[in-house]
Amino acid sequence: MKIIHANRFGEGKNLVIIHGFLGMGDNWKSLGKKWADNGFCVHLLDMRNHGRSFHSDEFNYQVMTQDVINYLIDQKIESCCIIGHSMGGKVAMQLA
């Protein structure tokens, strides 16, 4: 099982941020650091075929949703808030 790349900042309640198409977690770094300063453990994900995550010929919402689930399991995250932008928003809705 491949795990997507993520940067993590802060401590507290988990906040997972999923970027939009052609983006990466770093696009959310400024806001992520502010939320981290306000009591969140912020996870800035790089989805497959984006940023520093692995590349794959398989690319659809079902596998991206499973990638996030695999990340949450790997990080032992049982509860979190999720923010998704554009493509990431659709992944977030499928996680709900």
Region locations from a protein language model:
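N-terminal cap/lid segment of alpha/beta-hydrolase-fold proteins
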Residues: 1-3
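Conserved HGGG/HGGXW glycine-rich cap/lid loop of the alpha/beta-hydrolase fold
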Residues: 7-54
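Active-site signature of alpha/beta-hydrolase-fold catalytic machinery across serine-
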Residues: 30, 94-95
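Aromatic pocket-lining residues of Rossmann-like dinucleotide-binding sites
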Residues: 35, 95-96
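Active-site loop/oxyanion-hole signature of alpha/beta-hydrolase fold enzymes
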Residues: 43, 47-83
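Gly/Ala-rich beta-loop-alpha elbow adjacent to hydrolase catalytic centers
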Residues: 84-88, 92
